[in-house]
Structure formats: structure tokens, C-alpha cells
């Protein structure tokens, strides 16, 4: 068979008030290399024992749901995306599984179909659409219909502060209210609208202001990520546009002028030495496939 390698970027979601809607692809990657066919699925990886090495692996189980007739293969998975840190590790695995099915099953899926399938698995389009399309995405899931718009943000630099502690998405969602007062929803929605407009018009100072004024989720998650206010204050003093939780946390996501990202990252690393400070870039390619013939790309 033709050697096949699937590469999927990490992602950050929400960007403050764009809850379950806005996502940005990041320069951390999950890679899946497909080896030979086998009697049963085998996943070679160096992660801990909590990550399955058989057909229960999220990549494989997703692929088999998309294409139940898929022949088992041996695959090797590598990733520098931290697990359960709010950087889209599960979304990248889902996207990789869909592309694995697309390639091995000769499905010829369009990009829109991949986004639709991935959103159905994930429940919201922000992370998965960013990983598929690259760049910055704004998406909405209305019933079964997914709408996504992609925009370029090449002028932006990204810094991620990653703590040692894990935070499960279900735990982080459990602190959110089941009901939201109407007046709060109006206020939160207006801020989100301005965030999206500012992203589209490249008004980065406004983007930074809006991403720090979320009402949908961050006020409720502060108890789980108590360092957010102090990181936000320091980042602004060092020249960043804005700071927000990365997805459900616990990682912190900071937007900066592209040319200042290293300087700001170095300053933050000195202040918050207990956290891993990563100077990243926005990934503008999205999912890529290394193969002589690309299918559905």
C-alpha cells in the first residue's frame, strides 16, 4: 500500500466569549502513520496505559464508526498535544479518525462533510473545524446542521501556559449553570458578536478586549483555574492583546502581536515558572495527508 501519514493540528476553543463556536488551530500536532493491514487493529504509541492500543482507541473507534467495513491496520500515533489541558487533544483524535476512514475506505469526503461528521461526534464545531480547516473558525451547530466560516489571522502570535495539572472537560463543564438569565445572555452574546466582528476586521486591540469580557463560562471556571486573572494582568502589561481560558482549561491562551510573541513568552516564563510556557503559531493548513494521491482534500 502507499505509505500514509495523517497530521492534525491542536486547537484552542472559545477565545473568551465565543463559547462552543470560535476555534483557532495551533502549531502542535497529532500524527498517525498507517502501517500494514492486520487481523485486528493495533495502535503503537508511547502514551500512558490509559490510552487504548486496540480498537477502543478514539482514533480507531471513530474511523470504524465512519466506515464500519474498514480493514484493520497497524497504526503508529505520535503527538505533542498535551492531554486534557484544553488544547483539543480529543478533537484532533476524532479528526484523525475521520481522515483515516476517508483514506483507507476511499470515501472521498468533502471538507464540509468532514466538519459535519466531526461536529456530530464532538457536539460543537469549534475545535474540530479548526483542526480540519486551519486558521480561525467561527461555527454554529443548529440541530443537525453545521455552518462554519474560516478567516485568516496571520498577524497574530499565540502563547499557551500549560499547568502540570489535568482538567477533564466533563469536570470543567459541570460547574457551568444549566440555565442562563435572559439579560446575561443578551450581554454575553453582544460581546461575542463584537469579538467575531473584530476578528474579521483584524482589530486586534478590540479582539483582546472582548476575549477578556466573557460571561458564558469563564466566571464559573475561575475556581478551577485561579491563576487566570494574574496571568491576564501580566500578559497585558507585557504587550499581549488578550488572555482567555483555552477551551475548558486548565491551559491559558494568549494572543499577541506576531513579532512580540517570543519576548512576551520569555517574560511570562520568568513570572510563572511552575507552568510550561509555549510560544506557538496559528496553523493555517489544517489537516494534511502525506500520500501520493490525496482523497477528498
Curated annotation (Swiss-Prot):
SUPFAM superfamilies: GHMP Kinase, C-terminal domain, Ribosomal protein S5 domain 2-like. It holds the Pfam family GHMP_kinases_N. The keyword Nucleotide-binding applies. It catalyses: L-homoserine + ATP = O-phospho-L-homoserine + ADP + H(+). The keyword Zinc-finger does not apply. One of its GO terms (biological process) is threonine biosynthetic process. InterPro entries: GHMP_kinase_C_dom, GHMP_kinase_C_sf, GHMP_kinase_N_dom, GHMP_knse_ATP-bd_CS, Homoserine_kinase, Ribosomal_Su5_D2-typ_SF, Ribsml_uS5_D2-typ_fold_subgr. Pathway: Amino-acid biosynthesis; L-threonine biosynthesis; L-threonine from L-aspartate: step 4/5. One of its GO terms (cellular component) is cytoplasm. Keywords: Amino-acid biosynthesis, ATP-binding, Cytoplasm, Kinase, Nucleotide-binding, Threonine biosynthesis, Transferase. Its EC number is 2.7.1.39. GO terms for molecular function: ATP binding; homoserine kinase activity. It comes from the Bacteria. ATP binds at residues 82-92. It is found in: Cytoplasm. Catalyzes the ATP-dependent phosphorylation of L-homoserine to L-homoserine phosphate. NCBIfam families: thrB (TIGR00191). Belongs to the GHMP kinase family. Homoserine kinase subfamily. This is Homoserine kinase. It comes from Bacillus mycoides (strain KBAB4) (Bacillus weihenstephanensis).
